[in-house]
Amino acid sequence: MEDIFNFFDKPKDPLHFSSIKISISSPDKIRERSFGEVKKPETINYRTFKPERDGLFCAKIFGPTKDYECNCGKYKRMKHRGIVCEKCGVEVIPSKVRRERLGHIDLATPVAHIWFLKSLPSRIGNLMDITLKDLEKVLYFEAYVVTDPKETGLAFGTVFSEDQYQKALEEYSYGFEAGMGAAAIRTCLTSMDLDQLSEQLRIEMQEATSEAKRKKTAKRLKVMEAFKNSGNKPEWMILECIPVLPPELRPLVPLDGGRFATSDLNDLYRRVINRNNRLKRLMELQAPEVIIRNEKRMLQEAVDALFDNGRRGRAIAGPNKRPLKSLSDMLKGKSGRFRQNLLGKRVDYSGRSVIVVGPELRLHQCGLPKKMALELFKPFIYNKLEERGFVTTIKSAKKMVEKEKPEVWDVLEEVIKEHPVLLNRAPTLHRLGIQAFEPVLIEGKAIQLHPLVCTAFNADFDGDQMAVHLPLSVESQVEARVLMMSTNNILSPAHGKPIIVPSQDMVLGIYYMTREKHFALGEGKIFASADEVNIAWDAGEIHLQARIKVRMKNLVSDEKPTLIETTTGRVLLRDILPDAVPYATINKVMTKKELSNLVDVCYRLAGNKETVILADKLKAIGFRYAAKAGISISINDMVIPEGKPAIITRATEEVQEIQNQYTEGLITDGERYNKVIDIWAKSTEDIAKEMLDNLSRDTILDPEGKEVKVPSFNAIHMMADSGARGSAQQIRQLAGMRGLMAKPSGEIIETPITANFREGLTVLQYFISTHGARKGLADTALKTANSGYLTRRLVDVAQDAIITEADCGTIDGLTVSSLTEGGEVIEHIGDRILGRVALDDILDPVTGDVLVPANEEIDENLVARIEAAGLEKVKIRSVLTCESRRGICAKCYGRDLARGHLVNRGEAVGVIAAQSIGEPGTQLTMRTFHIGGTASRRAEQTALEARNEGFAKFININYVTNSEGHHIVMNRNGELAIVDETGREREKYGVVYGAKIKVSPQEKVTQGQSVAEWDPYTMPILTEIAGRVKFGDVIEGVTMEEQVDEVTGLSRKVIIETRDADKRPRITIKDESGKTAKIGDSLLARYYLPVGSNINVLEDTEVNAGDVIAKIPRETTKTKDITGGLPRVAELFEARKPKDFAVITEIDGVVAFGKDAKGKRKVLVTPELGEPKEYLIPKGKHISVHEGDHVRAGEALMDGSSNPHDILRVLGQKELAKYLVDEVQEVYRLQGVKINDKHIETIVRQMLRRVRVKDVGDTNLLIDDQIERWVFEEENEKAMDKGGRPATAESLLLGITKASLSTESFISAASFQETTKVLTQASIEGKIDSLRGLKENVIMGRLIPAGTGLALYRNLRMVAEEPVIIPEPVEPEDEEIYEEEA
């Protein structure tokens, strides 16, 4: 009887476990877990559809096909539960056991597991020290392996071919044992003594002379240690029996028409069973060795195909010619188990529909079609109907809902109240792609979306669809409301600025109402209060844009009311402002930028609730006035500037002039091309400038009849100026000149399109345009995929970066200063330190007062104080220097950008960082085609103009004065500063080698004066001394060729690569006596010419100091688009070595040149103390340092990009992090995308997690082992506690893919990439996954250990002490107090 009651029990909770282990299964384990051996390849009986006995679907082994019913039908129903039928041997239990019961196949001969054989590096091969090629020969019966050498002196594991084996037999006459196939390998593996072997290998490793030998030994040792420590036995890599998957997981489904659909696995198992049975029979019949060998080989191949089809040889195909899906394929790739079913599942209680705009919604609402709501909230409705007594059973409730009776709608209204729903728009690129709203029931079938959240979803209403999800449990509803509600996501997690900002029409409306119109109705009137303005406006006495004066009191402070110059519209706008926001914030023309600023100020001063109310009011007022303004554009609004023809004529003449110079041979073709492009780029800019000036100014008559220029109300200009739609770039194409276009390859076509869209394009111009436009479309498709993949890799590497503690107590941090480029500050120090935590006390440089105490968050007010004090550098805490073992501490991270306060524990900052970097990647990729491929190339900077007046100051510049009296810079990294009277630097510029400086040291400089100029397209080689030119090793056809220009017929000498290692083309300068001139005391005036340089002088001519003797052309410029972008970002995060990376010096010292070696040039750097270091630089590369130059560690000795690994090695982690952060930021800055530095730092931290062991000391580590930094530190602590010698290691920089694959969690790594490889390695090591990251917990179906799932929050308990009322003096009982578990 009890059994019956138990049957209706609630289903058991899933197992509670804290970690999961993977290891190799032993044959005994497989048999132990199996419920019987599968002996026959039959599946089901095709007439009765009953499973065949002992077959692949056998009910005796795997359980009954129908609940509580045996196969022959003798026992049916629940009362016979647990009985085994004596006729058919089937147990009477529920049929769902067919999903979990395993069978097995006993193999007639052992076979190798293909993962351990073929997954590189081959584990079996590694252990036995046999190459994979030989190992395959043995396993597939083409060669013998020595399993026991006995006294013959043969090495254990030697591989013999058939002939060699016969010879050996004759020689040793059976004094040894050898075999072939997996059985022989198994014998070898069983007889291995791992302890003794690993000792031997350790000794070998210490004695190893060559690097290669050491590495090989280390690899073997690693596999051995893994087997030793995990308790796996090597012979388990060879299978004696194979487990058979439960039949429900490889179903056989009858289709109509008597055919069957089957899982590929059944075919693969059938082949294995057939071959196995055949082999057994052949062995019983004692067939000839050849036949048995062949059958064994076929069995090995069948098992290989079952485990990993296509890994070896050709994949086995099914009847329809496509490869069968093996067990490995079930796990691998996008449609494998991990990514398809475990990381992303389809869910119920969801629906999707097209979205339309809902302008009358509040920010926290969305419009939900009644039909959808009825379906989504069904169970809730049934429940309510029953509660209300409308129905008595669920069935009748169902009928009632189907008929859509009026009561149902009333109930639905009630159910829906206060029950948030989640809206999601694919692709969900960052966390704002899913937000919670309160549903409002609407007619129709489209979801209504609030216009202000479109930016976050990146949604528009041209047919986008969105999905609705319903949070069911109370906890999930609370989280949706508190964390995900659109009103709680006003700030963007990527940069901390508001993301809920009016856009498009709303901006235009507010812009229009805050503009000033000269001489409008009511101009100059003075009002006593804002209310009076409202009355006058309602009465139609004043114009919306009239300039008026109003007496206003400051609501923020108690100052006296003052007269403020303003306009009617701005006073009207003030009505919607919260009191805390000062009027000055809106007393200006409100562009999109200003509106964003307004929302930001409101959030900081008035708080979240007020901001939400303001946002909704802005939306309403914006739409209202946009409608009132009635702005529309006509073709006449695109005013073509009058000066356009003149500019084009001038440019054409200049181009002709350049062409003439080229024809005369004064410049090379490359220079000509670059200059032509420059002229056109500049002309396009000029026309654009004039056009924008025209558009933005109108000329009108004032009351006296005089002409005055006033800001224009041109519709196109207003749209672009307000930031509502369109950009200067697009207007330029409409009314200016289309400009230069790029070829698909990225080069710029040198004939520009001089027409604009208003004038119309000629056929040729149209044709050139199509180039760029098509490239834009093609790029978009490709880049979206690339960007998505980048995001996926970033998320994977950073997913376990979670805020785990409040403060790690580190004393380390980063020094941050303003970012400058070309003397211009691109990012102020304030923007970089906002929301970070100060490392030490920040002191005022003048008074020494503490501006910010140590470990305090630097907020907006403190930033203002720091900037006012004029601090140039600030030390802050950083994720990079955080010492938390797992995760990151809140103090090192700083402010949670989306919330505006210090980050909470449990915040998944890694994923947020990955999304913040990845999301704009996709946006940017999609942004290319809007401009339609117009080449946007800045005219290269060729001169420096002083921005301030002052005195010129040369900072380590070596220069010579040429014949014209200009100073020519002769070294790199010199700087030119402008200082004021007090000697304070106002601006500072780097000057390049070969630049002409037009001022002398200490000379007075006026503002706007040109102080230096240079040629950006070539890199000159200059002579430092006057004399006669002599060539050395400049031999035509060997090291130099005369290149004749087809167009001009003129030739020039170009240095080419030579086969002859001894030839080194150079130019020497001789003095009067014919000797090589000396520069200073010791240096010879000898200049080596790199490959590709053009010689500018003739032999035996006189040159002066500072003259150019040769030029190295720079590449023709390509347009900068985020193509330089996305791949560049990926390259940085993958830590790839650039193609031609520069050799950098590892020490400070003085440069000297040594003798050439192996066709490379030798550069010596000699420090003040110690040995000189030598660097070899390939010939033909331009060496950018000169003899006698001082260089600093980390400086490049030649042209080329930096190699991040070198930076880490030479300059350390902080410099590397700075380099990576700056480089990534530069790519995004080019696109105008803001990302906070800390996100990039978070990713870089994950890339720097590991170290490589250099010296093992007295620890258990292996040399060259790559391990987590904290594991290394722990091992060292252990060794030092015992008084041993610690190990040493060097920092490693891993690319994001590598870092993801080398995480501790094998589940996370396997679900990312290279599944088989990861699982193979993990099972050998017997790895334990302690489920610490997010991904592995999602896969195991648990709550993630972040956010509200953090243990810290899961274990909170309420403590309630109830007052004890004692009526009579009774024996008091103990009160129960629930302790809070921290």
Curated annotation (Swiss-Prot):
GO cellular component: DNA-directed RNA polymerase complex
Enzyme superclass (EC): transferase
Signal peptide span: none
Pfam families noted in UniProt: RNA_pol_Rpb1_1, RNA_pol_Rpb1_2, RNA_pol_Rpb1_3, RNA_pol_Rpb1_4, RNA_pol_Rpb1_5
Gene3D superfamilies: 1.10.132.30, 1.10.150.390, 1.10.1790.20, 1.10.40.90, 2.40.40.20, 2.40.50.100, RNA polymerase II, clamp domain (4.10.860.120), RNA polymerase Rpb1, domain 3 (1.10.274.100)
EC number in record: 2.7.7.6
Catalytic activity from the UniProt record: RNA(n) + a ribonucleoside 5'-triphosphate = RNA(n+1) + diphosphate
Gene Ontology BP, a term: DNA-templated transcription
CDD domains: RNAP_beta'_C, RNAP_beta'_N
Domain of life per record: Bacteria
Name the UniProt record assigns to this protein: DNA-directed RNA polymerase subunit beta'
Sequence positions that bind Zn(2+) 2: C808, C882, C889, C892
Cofactor note as given: Binds 1 Mg(2+) ion per subunit.
Gene: rpoC
Binding residue positions for Mg(2+): D460, D462, D464
Keywords attached to this entry: DNA-directed RNA polymerase, Magnesium, Metal-binding, Nucleotidyltransferase, Transcription, Transferase, Zinc
